[in-house]
């Protein structure tokens, strides 16, 4: 795991191994799995692997984090641990663009919620309006099916 997180900062940003490892340990603690630092990815649960991926991305100090269905391949028990990390990132004002079907998560942390259908933007709104008073019929149908 440690090598997985430190490789890009050392190769791309040119930081020292010691600095990269210190930051990696801090990031693993931030995502709630500091004890996994010296394990192999194959020894981790799906939720732990996803949190390592988040730590790896954060190691590069991105301005924006992109997530494409970060919980889609996880067992139901693992979904909460990944969403909890993402909620913490949102509280720390990390800018995120998240593709998700986790509507409770979107309602809780999003500044804007956007619905696309067949490549077309259907609705973009605040979570309150999007979920409680959507402007478009397609959004209403989507919410009826998924909520």
Tell what function each PLM region has.
Residues 106-108:
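A short, surface-exposed alpha-helical micro-motif characterized by mixed small hydrophobic
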Residues 79-92:
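Helical segment within the ABC ATPase nucleotide-binding domain
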Residues 59-63:
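A short, proline-enriched helix->beta-strand linker immediately N-terminal to the Walker B motif
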Residues 40-44, 48:
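Conserved ABC ATPase signature
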